[in-house]
Amino acid sequence: SICYDDTSGGDALDNRELRVVLAGVCALLGRKIDLLGMDACLMNMLEVAWQLRDSVNVIVGSEIEEPFDGWPYAEILSRLAARPRQDAAALARWIVKSYLLSYKGKDETVTQSALDLSRINNVVRKIDVLSGTLLAALETDAKPIAAAWKKSPRFYDDNYIDLLCFAKQLRRLPAPDLRAVAEALIAALKPGKGRLILSQGKIGREVRGTGGLSIYFPGDRINPAYRALDF
């Protein structure tokens, strides 16, 4: 959830409501939102990005909890004012860089990434294939798969897992089918221009090696609300 309102009992927008709200904004604008900045915790996950794919071109956010200081708005707004015609992808990459610089030397653990949602279908297709392969492998490789989960960075009471790190752990397993689909996902998660992950960075030992995008992967019970998401 995002946009908590302390004046109404802590009400907030969940992922389904966020999709509806932004679809309404797009209807008013007559086009997609160029860039959505989410200065909030845990927002750059695959399920959130999938919810927003029809409303937003580029999103910037963190896959972990953000410090209370949040974004360096003075620098970001100054950049936007100085370069009003800068395209969304370029500005998003700059925001990621500026955010990380603002926490350098402050003993904070942070992540930030920019996602081009026009490229999300390719990654979701790779996830679909990986999911099917994992299900088929559970009978023979449940313990190695569980070990790969445990060795991957997890966030929010272990409910979210870094997608890239998990794929890299799966790539080490003996099952050739799993290794192949994990390798394909790793390639799809490579950051750069024209890719889903335009840019990503992190500071802190706890997030070393993370790739800028998480996925919901709890260790036991799945939240019933998850089934109502587009993903």
Predicted stretch roles:
Residues 1-231:
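Terminal, contiguous helix-loop blocks that mediate binding/assembly
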